[in-house]
Amino acid sequence: FHEAALVSVAVSVEQPEENDAINIRGTLNVLQAARAAGVKRVVLASSAAVYGNNPALPKREDMLPEPESPYALGKLAGEHYLKLFSHLYGVETVALRYFNVFGPRQDGKSMYSGVISRFVDDIRAGRAPTIFGDGNQTRDFVFVKDVVQANVLAMRSQEVGNGEVLNVARGQQISLLQLWEALRGITGSKLVPSFREARPGDIRHSLADISKIRKVLCYQPQFDLEYGLGQIVAPG
């Protein structure tokens, strides 16, 4: 399982060479090592960022990628390397395009953290959260346990292994404002968010078509957003 990466779109925009070294060269290094060691299969954590701001929804795996950041471009390059290593060297490969993964133990103070963990960290600190943009941008959040399910299925399935690309999500979208209201409802917070200019490379709307992964891997998301948020904000 190749899960390591520079995962911040904003950092990739500021440091494209670092992104290239980690997300492109790093993936190539993993594939080379797997080939040398006789590893049968490599499963890559790719990203929905490869779709870019194409307004068509939901995002399907056969859509033309339109990367808007070095991060997205690096993930797309990794997918192509997987296909090449499968076809040229016989290494079985699968790329999973993660949408917005969330779950307990994400560090809300980290620059690499997702919006949910940052919101929760703000609530705990009594600090007004910052929303980049108008808050109407949408995301398709998927709980980490469902991502684990997808990875295990991708590693074990005989239906994949030739560089296939599969979306990993719930197939439901929610705006950041709706997300904030959901967290307020769970925690009782009275904080009001502040708004800043949208960041370069950020995606406006995101929603996955998960029919392919359901058909090919029998993937079925088990955990809804309410459950996941409850797991994050629960004491301890």
Label every model-predicted segment:
Residues 1-101, 145, 219, 223:
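N-terminal Rossmann-like NAD(P)+-binding domain of SDR-like oxidoreductases, especially those catalyzing
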Residues 10, 56, 120-121, 157-158:
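Short secondary-structure boundary/capping segments
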Residues 34, 86, 122-123, 184:
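A generic structural signal for well-ordered alpha-helical segments
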Residues 70, 78, 112, 176, ...:
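Conserved donor sugar-nucleotide recognition element shared by glycan-biosynthetic enzymes
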Residues 77, 81, 85, 115, ...:
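Hydrophobic alpha-helix immediately C-terminal to the catalytic Tyr-X-X-X-Lys motif of short-chain
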Residues 108-115:
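Conserved catalytic loops of nucleotide-sugar-dependent glycosyltransferases that act on lipid-linked
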Residues 123-236:
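C-terminal substrate-binding subdomain of Rossmann-fold SDR/epimerase-dehydratase oxidoreductases
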